[in-house]
Amino acid sequence: AKKRAGNGCFGLKLDRIGSMSGLGC
């Protein structure tokens, strides 16, 4: 979940957590 959904979604800020990064998309 590093650059999975945090590519262009709001998960960029939550990309560090990696958990909410997927929920971003």
Curated annotation (Swiss-Prot):
Major localization listed first in the record, in broad terms: secreted
Gene Ontology CC annotations of this record: extracellular region
Tissue: Venom gland.
Record-given protein name: C-type natriuretic peptide
UniProt family annotation: In the C-terminal section; belongs to the natriuretic peptide family.
Highest taxon listed in the record's lineage: Eukaryota
Disulfide links within the chain: 9-25
Annotated compartments: Secreted
Keywords associated with the record: Disulfide bond, Hypotensive agent, Secreted, Toxin, Vasoactive, Vasodilator
Database matches in InterPro entries: Natr_peptide, Natr_peptide_CS, Natriuretic_peptide_brain
Function: Snake venom natriuretic peptide that has a vasorelaxant activity in rat aortic strips and a diuretic potency in anesthetized rats. May act by activating natriuretic receptors (NPR1 and/or NPR2).
GO process annotations (BP): regulation of blood pressure; vasodilation
Entry's Gene Ontology molecular function annotations: hormone activity; toxin activity
